[in-house]
Amino acid sequence: MSPLWRLVHAALLLATALLALPAAAATDCVIDAVAAAGFGAYDGMQNDGAMTTITGRCTNTPPPGTGPTIFPVISLSPGLAASYAPRQMTSGASRLNYNLFTTAARTVVWGNGSGSTATVPAYLAAFALSGNQTLAFNNPNLTIYGRIPPNQTAATGLYADTITVTLTF
């Protein structure tokens, strides 16, 4: 066999082997929406609460038992105050303390898992049972519970903060 023929033969074998490899799309998870949480007018005599939800999905997840299992987790940033204890909304130079929690009891601060904060798993519910699946978040804990504590002196104005929602999978 000539050296040229050996090279062509080796290239054909490699091409044939590559064609035989199965192709698979990578799993991808996204957050579809986070509704804005509106506290309304602050009442300095009692806790003010608000709720909002996170919706999302993962695509190209393998059927159970056929590939790696994914465990999406949602974390929240501390916001503009750069602290979870407490978070602060601002209106100009004025500040209003508040926080975001993992449950309606409002006892565990939703954060990034550092200090006394917790992240929340985004359990998945299958939309399809064969082939690669599209899965939606199906977890009652994907509600964010907010609270502004009472007895704060706050100047009149519109208060806001920006929270980054991170999905890790």
Model region roles, listed by residue range:
Residues S75-G79, N99-T103, G111-G115:
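Predominantly extracellular/luminal cell-surface or secreted proteins
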Residues A20-P22:
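N-terminal signal peptide c-region/cleavage motif recognized by signal peptidases
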